Amino acid sequence: MTINEDAKKKIALLSQGLPHYTHLLSLYAFQRAASTDRSHVEIGDVRTAIDTALAKTQQSIISTYHRATNSPRENLYSQVLLSCALAQPDSLGYFSAVDVRKPLTILMNKPYEIPAFSQHLNAFCEFSRGPVLQRTGTARRFRFRFENPLMQPYVVMDGIRKGLINDDLKSSKS
């Protein structure tokens, strides 16, 4: 079997260097191609693989994501968490609130300042919303990273599935 270069790049981008998601997305994309009697994987097969991978994700990831984003009221928790997943991390996987601002502004199609979502970041570090993020540093200089490295790609793929971002990890509203 062979794979389209764009499909290969998409799998690498979505898996964010984690073998777990690289293998999972590849497996489901190749299975999709084989199930339709093709020996070549296309980008559409990867899109289908995203849905399958999300449906078969570890229950602990799904439960933590649900706890982090679920609320009876209208809120920004899922958008802020997606923005965290899209934020540019440092070499250790940490990002700051400043790094979250740009993806959130693009995602919501309006400017957001740090005070508008800083309580969300702090909540993600507490048991009531996860904890989905780890926090290090001191006040006004906090750095965050995902508690479980498998959560970040899951959040991105869920954003694609929900139509919040496109396959190129850009806002679907732009």
Report each predicted region and the residues it spans.
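Conserved small helical "lid"/interfacial subdomain of P-loop NTPases
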Residues: M1-A7, L14-H20, L25
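Short acidic, glycine/proline-enriched loop segments that cap or flank alpha-helices
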Residues: T2, S91-L92, N109-Y112, Q134
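Amphipathic alpha-helical interaction segments
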Residues: D6, K10, L24, Q79, ...
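Amphipathic alpha-helical segments within well-ordered protein domains
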Residues: K9-A12, T105
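Winged-helix-like regulatory helical subdomains adjacent to P-loop NTPase cores
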Residues: H23-N109
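Short, amphipathic alpha-helical interaction segments positioned at domain boundaries
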Residues: T57-I62, F142, E147-S174
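Short amphipathic alpha-helical interaction segments
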Residues: L107-R129
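Short, Lys/Arg-rich nucleic-acid/phosphate-binding segment
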Residues: Q134-R143
